[in-house]
Amino acid sequence: MNINPLIYFSSSSSNSHRFVQKLEIPAFRIPINQSDSPLNITSPYILLTPSYGGGSTKGAVPPQVIRFLNIAENRAFIRGVIAAGNTNFGEAYGIAGRIISEKCRIPLLYRFELLGTEEDVQRVRQGIQRFWQHDSLENM
């Protein structure tokens, strides 16, 4: 089965990076530093992002993700979002995913806490496979 790459952001703490590595699927990381070359996407993808801001909507989406999505071509190819968050923030748990979902009019596919569990890894891996299988069947 052909799976489109996962696009993700992970800060220098690398929590999201470690989660993505466990998925064992093709993935590209959005650069941390503004001085790095931007990531330009030319095919459909799912975005995985952490949520920032300590429970506030202000600053919830990492600025690197905002810059990435402000590139029209990158925004055009987004098909879904997965969010990492902290359940201590209650209603704001994984809020970056909800914000991106609403602004880009795409589904929020999954939320997981902090580093995620093995169950989260399995659910995300299987969910991504089903998502792309369904997408490819619709485009036949």
Swiss-Prot record:
<dbReference type="InterPro" id="IPR020852">
    <property type="entry name" value="RNR_Ib_NrdI_bac"/>
</dbReference>
<dbReference type="GO" id="GO:0010181">
    <property type="term" value="F:FMN binding"/>
</dbReference>
<dbReference type="InterPro" id="IPR004465">
    <property type="entry name" value="RNR_NrdI"/>
</dbReference>
<dbReference type="InterPro" id="IPR029039">
    <property type="entry name" value="Flavoprotein-like_sf"/>
</dbReference>
<protein>
    <recommendedName>
        <fullName>Protein NrdI</fullName>
    </recommendedName>
</protein>
<comment type="similarity">
    <text>Belongs to the NrdI family.</text>
</comment>
<dbReference type="GO" id="GO:0036211">
    <property type="term" value="P:protein modification process"/>
</dbReference>
<comment type="function">
    <text>Probably involved in ribonucleotide reductase function.</text>
</comment>
<dbReference type="Pfam" id="PF07972">
    <property type="entry name" value="Flavodoxin_NdrI"/>
</dbReference>
